[in-house]
């Protein structure tokens, strides 16, 4: 008699995805972040559901309802800060996950990679709309500034902005629809994540060497289930430390002031995980150009499979491109720092140089270094 997990229609899917899945024996801890993203998503959906039970998406009561959650709901403060800081952990895992994919050449799995880019846009949209919901100063002005960027779209721009606002400014209609979208998107993300895994399991996982690992596979369970469990424990430990000791470390104090359309905060800036893109947006002194650069800063990931010139997949044995990769990582940290600074000298010029460097490394230097390494190794 066959095992039920191998015969039952539902359990069979789970078995092929998480139990008997043949996995490369040498994947490192950088491969833990996919499962951590799944844990983050589940955590966000659960905490978000409980927050939605007490939140009201009306401009007159939204801010008070969040205060009510923190003051009067049993462990409401915990749920709220788990949700807010859970988003930060989500993005830390997301950036590491994408960075791993770039480093080890995982972008050669085209379908998996492209679904991943769509997932990234969906997560960013969800986080942006979630930031608007508490209806603090930074919520309101962030929503105003970012939605206004759509007015740069030629011909239909202004109509598009008013259509998204549901009026002539960010108001009740905007908040209500943002709440609706913020609620539905995580479920769409969960569905997309399943498609992401479906395509990944068509090809099998990549590994640090970038070589074919068909000859050396081990079952996912118990090896990687245990390894993932350790990652989950560390993630929850980090999140717990953040929530219980430094709940407002990554937030903006301006968001503790109720939204006021008549009073602009001195420095409008998004949450830390958007600062790199915000810095790229601000570094171009033209509205449409800035918006295009903003979108391209993420969409450029879709070009990576076509810019791959090396005969080797991974950067593991490619010191020149490795150096460029870490310069790119440092450049992203620089952009993140600049995005949080006021628009004045010397921050403007640093941001512009960092933005140029970002696109240059990806579009010019990395493809060239791939060719150079091929020549050195006599692969061309």
Swiss-Prot record:
Its main location: mitochondrion. A ubiquinone binds at residue 201. Gene3D superfamilies: Cytochrome Bc1 Complex, Chain C. This is Cytochrome b. Heme b b566 binds at residues 97, 196. It is a multi-pass membrane protein. The keyword Endoplasmic reticulum does not apply. Its cofactor is heme b. The gene is MT-CYB.
């Amino acid at each position: 008699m066959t095992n039920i997990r191998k015969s039952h229609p539902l359990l069979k899917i789970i078995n092929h995805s998480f139990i008997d899945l043949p996995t490369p024996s040498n994947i490192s801890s950088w491969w833990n972040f996919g499962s951590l993203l799944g844990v983050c998503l589940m955590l966000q959906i659960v905490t978000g559901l409980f927050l939605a039970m007490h939140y009201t998406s009306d401009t007159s009561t939204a801010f008070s309802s969040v205060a009510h959650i923190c003051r009067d709901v049993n462990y409401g403060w915990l749920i709220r800060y788990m949700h807010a800081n859970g988003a930060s952990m989500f993005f830390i895992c997301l950036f590491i996950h994408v960075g791993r994919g770039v480093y080890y050449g995982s972008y050669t799995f085209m379908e998996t990679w492209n679904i991943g880019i769509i997932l990234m846009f969906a997560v960013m949209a969800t986080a942006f709309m979630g930031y608007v919901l508490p209806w603090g100063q930074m919520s309101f002005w962030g929503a105003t500034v970012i939605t206004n960027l759509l007015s740069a779209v030629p011909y239909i721009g202004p109509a598009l902005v008013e259509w998204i606002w549901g009026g002539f400014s960010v108001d009740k209609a905007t908040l209500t629809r943002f709440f609706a979208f913020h609620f539905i998107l995580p479920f769409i993300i969960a569905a997309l994540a399943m498609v992401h895994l479906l395509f990944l399991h068509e090809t099998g996982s990549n590994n640090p060497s970038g070589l074919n690992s068909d000859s050396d596979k081990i079952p996912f369970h118990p090896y990687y289930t245990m390894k993932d469990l350790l990652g989950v424990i560390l993630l929850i430990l980090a999140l717990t430390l953040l929530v219980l000791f430094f709940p407002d470390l990554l937030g903006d104090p301006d968001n503790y002031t109720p939204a006021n359309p008549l009073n602009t905060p001195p420095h409008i800036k998004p949450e830390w995980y958007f600062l790199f893109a915000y810095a790229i947006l601000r570094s171009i002194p033209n509205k449409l150009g800035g918006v295009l650069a903003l979108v391209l800063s993420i969409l450029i990931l879709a070009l990576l499979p076509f810019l791959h010139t090396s005969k080797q997949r991974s950067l593991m044995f490619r010191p020149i491109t490795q150096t460029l990769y870490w310069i790119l990582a440092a450049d992203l940290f620089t952009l993140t720092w600049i995005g949080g600074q006021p628009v004045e000298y010397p921050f403007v010029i640093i941001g512009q140089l960092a933005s140029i460097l970002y696109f240059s490394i990806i579009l010019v230097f990395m493809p060239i270094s791939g060719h150079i390494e091929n020549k050195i190794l006599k692969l061309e």
